Amino acid sequence: MLFLLAFAFAGCFTERGDEGELLYGRHCASCHLENGEGLRGVIPPLVNSDYSEKNRDVLACLIRQGIQGSIIVNGKEYNQAMPGNQQLSEADLTNIINYLHKEFKSPKERVSFGQVREQVKNCP
């Protein structure tokens, strides 16, 4: 019963207006820029990112834990480390990912709080 209450309560704090935009601005925009285009040749774009789409099932983990090493985004190689943010809650991650979907079409589908919770639970 307590689990159900916690799950329902957490859902109250996702999808709050512009929360995803605020979180993106605070934690992501300094590198990926407000328009999601990244820094050409250094920081990958988030706009229509095939990498975000291919990694949709672990996107919450990537945001929380960061990325090390080389990645390919939209056919271009990037080798700039992305710091993670362990402080982001599951609700924060849900809001950020859904903001990426809404603004940058990446990933192509929205995520639910439950999907993000499962991703975080299974992070390597």
What are these regions, as identified by a protein language model?
Residues 15-39, 54-61:
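Sequence/structural segment immediately N-terminal to covalent heme-attachment motifs in c-type
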Residues 33, 64-68, 98-102:
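Residues at helix-coil transition
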Residues 1-6:
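Sec-dependent signal peptide recognition
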